[in-house]
């Protein structure tokens, strides 16, 4: 059964679907970061906020933490206590859970949250694609193709393209550096007149 709220994945990859090297992004494209912020902060209901869900390595890799104007959810079983103590003074904006199931339950129960975005890293992306693809409504995907990047963390592209439909109207090509695409989960029914983001 799919979620009542929109749970989405947003990911940027190289042309061979790498997402980073040793827990660091391999590119820095300000326009793409603005796209990420716009997608993850936009709410139809101005009284609500979105949340971003990430693993601990993604959390620690953020230059500025937490990501503003969003509830930040960190998933870590091994370092749950440590991270919980580190963020104890930001309980309104940061939540820590031991597993993704608890995070999904929190999203469903929290009336302040409009949509959720899974933002990495590779382990969390691939766990969600493997076990919870039926919950994922939209796939926001950026492919960076300005040059070849060396990556050692990858996302399961075969699962993405087998389960999400990307339409031409939802593809944007940005000055020969990257393309952004919005994919619709083939297993979820929803109005097709929704505007592209």
Label the predicted regions.
Residues 2-197:
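Enzymes that bind and transform nitrogen-containing heteroaromatic metabolites
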């Amino acid at each position: 059964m799919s979620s009542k709220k929109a749970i989405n994945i947003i990911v940027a990859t190289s042309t061979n679907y790498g997402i980073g090297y040793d827990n660091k992004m391999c590119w820095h494209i300000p326009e793409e970061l603005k796209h990420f912020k716009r997608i993850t902060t936009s709410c139809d209901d101005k009284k609500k906020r979105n949340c971003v869900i990430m693993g601990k390595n993604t959390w620690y890799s953020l230059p500025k933490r937490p990501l503003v104007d969003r509830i930040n959810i960190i998933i870590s079983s091994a370092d749950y206590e440590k991270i919980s103590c580190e963020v104890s003074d930001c309980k309104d904006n940061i939540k820590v859970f031991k597993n993704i199931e608890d995070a999904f339950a929190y999203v469903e129960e929290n009336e302040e949250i409009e949509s959720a975005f899974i933002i990495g890293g590779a382990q969390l992306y691939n766990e969600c694609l493997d076990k919870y693809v039926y919950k994922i409504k939209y796939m926001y995907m950026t492919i960076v193709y300005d040059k070849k990047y060396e990556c050692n963390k990858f996302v399961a592209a075969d699962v993405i393209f087998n389960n999400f439909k990307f339409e031409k109207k939802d593809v944007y090509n940005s000055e020969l550096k990257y393309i952004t695409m919005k994919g619709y989960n083939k297993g979820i029914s929803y109005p097709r007149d929704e505007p592209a983001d």
